[in-house]
């Protein structure tokens, strides 16, 4: 319902869409790169501060939220956060989600259910017509209310829960 790039028209200037990516693994990095190529203004967050340079190298802004001590496994995966850290993360992301046109969540913890990061309260604060893509829906989802294989509309925000997005473009996947 909204164009991604900034456009100058005879009727005026259309500002670029704002995209917020949560989780900067392989899927998150691809989401950042794609949104930037399409002309969006992109911000990204991950509990692993070591990915900041990767986010910046793609032209996005890395969102810093002080969660205290966060770690990653030897394989580079994020470790589970405490309840207190999750609350801090949600508080830090609340304003960013509210001002974003698109939120893409990819956060998963190896061997565990995906953390619920986007609360229904955060969804309610988003602008009408905003879209959330929950790419972690197959392991429980990052968004309250997301359902696997469905597009759910909550408070005029569309939440897309699709565990097999590559299957939507089989020729290229």
Predicted regions and their residues:
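ADP-ribose/adenylate-binding Rossmann-like module
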Residues: 102-152, 156-160
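Short Asp/Glu-rich motifs
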Residues: 54-55, 74, 116, 144, ...
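Short gly/pro-enriched beta-turn/loop segments at secondary-structure junctions
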Residues: 38, 57, 97-99, 126-128, ...
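Short, ordered loop/turn segments at secondary-structure junctions
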Residues: 47-49, 67-68, 108-109, 136-140, ...
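A structured beta-alpha segment of the ubiquitous adenosine-cofactor-binding alpha/beta core
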Residues: 73-103, 107-121, 162
